[in-house]
A protein has these predicted regions:
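The catalytic-center signature of Zn2+-dependent metalloproteases
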Residues: 74-144
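Metzincin-family zinc-dependent endopeptidase catalytic domain
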Residues: 1-88, 92-95, 106
Length: 145
């Protein structure tokens, strides 16, 4: 959460999150769900109005993480949680293999060695700062009404 708040302060001038121990009244609720082989490792349940404003609360489901090659369970959990929190902020998938919000299915050519190296590095060392350009682009259109 601290990482996301630092990114939000830099991009938007405000903090995005405040920790709350109770689900009641929370705007973003994180739930841990059983892992299933045919399901994604995380999922953001959210809805938006016609103007694109997200309705609250947003529910984030995170599956039990498993190590992926040289990437630890803890890193996988952080990467998936950070990605789903990005959706809670309204961020879509991106084609940037270095972004925490990568990737739209089929949008990145992992057969390209340079692209693959960047993608793997971003999964092994996920960085929420990778979404700064997306946040800076997304929110001003809501705040300038």
């Amino acid at each position: 959460m601290d990482g996301w708040n630092a990114v939000a302060r830099e991009a938007l001038g405000v903090e995005a999150f405040r920790w709350q121990d109770r689900e009641e009244g929370a705007e973003v609720v994180v739930r841990f769900v059983p892992a299933a082989a045919d399901q994604p490792r995380g999922y953001a349940h959210l809805d938006a109005d016609d103007a694109g404003v997200i309705r609250l609360p947003v529910h984030l489901d995170l599956a039990e993480p498993v190590a992926m090659g040289a990437t630890s369970r803890e890193t996988v959990l952080f990467q998936v949680a950070a990605h789903e929190i990005g959706h809670a902020l309204g961020l879509p998938h991106t084609d940037d293999p270095g972004s925490i919000m990568c990737c739209r299915e089929g949008a990145v050519n992992l057969g390209d060695p340079g692209v693959r190296a960047r993608y793997v590095e971003a999964r092994r060392r996920p960085d929420v700062r990778s979404v700064l350009p997306q946040l800076r682009e997304l929110y001003p259109r809501f705040w300038q009404r």
